[in-house]
């Protein structure tokens, strides 16, 4: 019986935690929005993901990381292009690999 009360107490603590952090309220709002949707989406899970994702404020660090990622992609593309040009120049000045082995 004591084990049952301990598990019940943990559940109650967890429920209070979810209430205080706003999780239950947010989940309820999203589920109500799905319920009230005139045309139910084909994927309820996608609906939940979309609406839960929109409920959280955007972390400013995420935007900085997105900008950094875009810059790194540009640098990568420039490096790939430069690498192609340098390889083309190298072919002009070095004999093919088969000729080197024959020597």
Swiss-Prot record:
Q: Which cysteines are joined by disulfide bonds?
A: none
According to the record, what induces this protein's expression? Answer: MYCBP expression is synergistically activated by SP1 and GATA-1.
Q: Does the keyword Transcription apply?
A: yes
Its annotated compartments are: Cytoplasm; Nucleus
Q: Which family does it belong to?
A: Belongs to the AMY1 family.
Gene Ontology terms: cellular component: cytoplasm; nucleus
UniProt-recorded name of the protein? c-Myc-binding protein
What InterPro entries does the database record attribute to this sequence?
Answer: AMY1
Task: Provide a Gene Ontology MF annotation, just one.
Answer: transcription coactivator activity
Assembly notes: Binds via its C-terminal region to the N-terminal region of MYC. Associates with AKAP1/S-AKAP84. Interacts with MYCBPAP. Interacts with CFAP91.
* Signal sequence coordinates: none
Keywords assigned:
Cytoplasm, Nucleus, Transcription, Transcription regulation
UniProt organism field: Mus musculus
GO BP of this protein: regulation of DNA-templated transcription
Report which superkingdom the organism of origin falls in: Eukaryota
Q: Which PANTHER family match?
A: ASSOCIATE OF C-MYC AMY-1, C-MYC-BINDING PROTEIN
Q: What does this protein do?
A: May control the transcriptional activity of MYC. Stimulates the activation of E box-dependent transcription by MYC.
